[in-house]
């Protein structure tokens, strides 16, 4: 049995969290290869180290004195070192980092949180430190070079029984430090799990897995103990943020389960993510997630269905502006294009002008206060009447459905409602399928 064990920013925020990690590692000898993020917030008003590093880079870029920002960063690491009684000469490394700041790229600067954290963690656990820049390789198109990365990881696996590995970065095809998107430490852990053929990828954070709904909307929502990759992808895409959605693909391809666990409550069951889960939750749905601030463009044209390529023309206009499309619900003579407001706001009027000129619609309207809520669950396809029950519940609660979209795999029903009805919609769906479990 081999586990890749990744700890997020809240799990490495201070010396006390380091101690919890050591206890977790010592409880299970299969936790041999550890990935860490940069230290996160210790309390609500605190700063994440990565945020401070981005701020440090901005000061450097605009020639503003950055000494006060650097001091905050340095003190965090020294505090961890001193409280744990470590010998790592991290002060010298940090000072050298600051001295050479102007010669560094943004990627190098913002990746140092993981780098320094991994160095301290390696000493504290008595494990080897393996630098991600020597292992993870990107291609010119910024995708992972799996062959090169896997070969380098296998070599380190043969060399060390245990090591600590910094998340979030690797090396580009040109030999420079390259970072993943924010939260990319999850991706690093998934890469290690795939390349080392792990049996489980453990992802430790500050919550006990996924919940069936947002706890800021639904009071004490039930936890999700088992979920498929497909369900997770749907929920993550719509805003359920425990795991970086791009971390799913490497382990899904290798059929490796992900186990989301809580560093502060290691006894909790957490959430197991695997492609084919035989465990039934007892509910027709797995979870509910949603996002606000979408825009819907409605296009109506008489006899549209007789015009070959009519919808394609609209999509090609949006493609020219690099606009990603969320949904395209359609009828015989009309269709809606749903996009995120922030993607289209700057170019909206130009795009509408192109639509009028090239599509010559009989009606063209825009609704810009849309929220999307997805109800997700592999069990829905086995339960006739699920969508009818959902729509009926919303109607009974005077929530007007502006848009409906259902995936062909029948694990997701997405409804569009006015932004003002977002919270109420999530609550009603939860109460309908979970609160009053049949």
Language-model-detected regions and their locations in the chain:
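Nucleotide/pyrophosphate-binding catalytic subdomain
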Residues: 1-243, 248, 340, 416-418, ...
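Structural motif
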Residues: 2-3, 31-34, 107-108, 127-128, ...
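Short helix/loop capping segments that flank catalytic or ligand/cofactor-binding pockets
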Residues: 44, 174, 212-213, 259-261, ...
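Internal glycine-rich alpha/beta core junctions
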Residues: 123, 261-263
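Positions that flank functional sites
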Residues: 135-137, 208-209, 266, 333, ...
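A conserved regulatory-domain signal marking ACT and ACT-like small-molecule sensing domains
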Residues: 269-438
